[in-house]
Amino acid sequence: MLKLFVKYTSIGVLNTLIHWVVFGVCIYAAHTSQALANFTGFVVAVSFSFFANARFTFKASTTAMRYMYYVGFMGILSVIVGWAADKCSLPPIVTLITFSAISLVCGFVYSKFIVFRDAK
């Protein structure tokens, strides 16, 4: 399980970079809310994360159903974190760090035991 988590984390580093860049563009160039910026960053990064983790971490096939489960769960998580950040007036960097930490742990557990549970 540790080996899988290390692989998942490695892909997560790239995923986080993608997410943060898109988030920054939304906040500072497009002047969106944190909820929208976080969700947009997520949408761009989640596809990379799903396909990379399916192939390299879990060695599983990609199906539309698996994709919908993954995107749905992570999308809800993204919106909740962004909404809470807006309500608490958190600085954008705190939102990014918070979502990155929560999504790493929750995303791994959800991927391993729900999305890719049948993967060999």
From Swiss-Prot:
Q: Which UniProt keywords apply?
A: Membrane, Transmembrane, Transmembrane helix, Transport
Report the membrane topology from the UniProt record. Answer: Multi-pass membrane protein
Q: What is the lineage of its organism?
A: Viruses, Duplodnaviria, Heunggongvirae, Uroviricota, Caudoviricetes
Q: Which GO terms describe its cellular component?
A: plasma membrane
Q: Look up keyword Transmembrane and say if it applies.
A: yes
Identify the Pfam families for this entry: GtrA_DPMS_TM
**Organism source for this protein?**
Shigella phage SfII (Shigella flexneri bacteriophage II)
- Name of the gene this protein is made from: gtrA
Task: Give the main location.
Answer: membrane
Subcellular location as annotated: Membrane
TM ranges: 10-30, 34-54, 65-85, 90-110
GO annotation (BP), single:
polysaccharide biosynthetic process
The family line of this record is: Belongs to the GtrA family.
Q: What the protein does?
A: Involved in O antigen modification. Involved in the translocation of bactoprenol-linked glucose across the cytoplasmic membrane.
Spell out the protein name for this chain.
Bactoprenol-linked glucose translocase
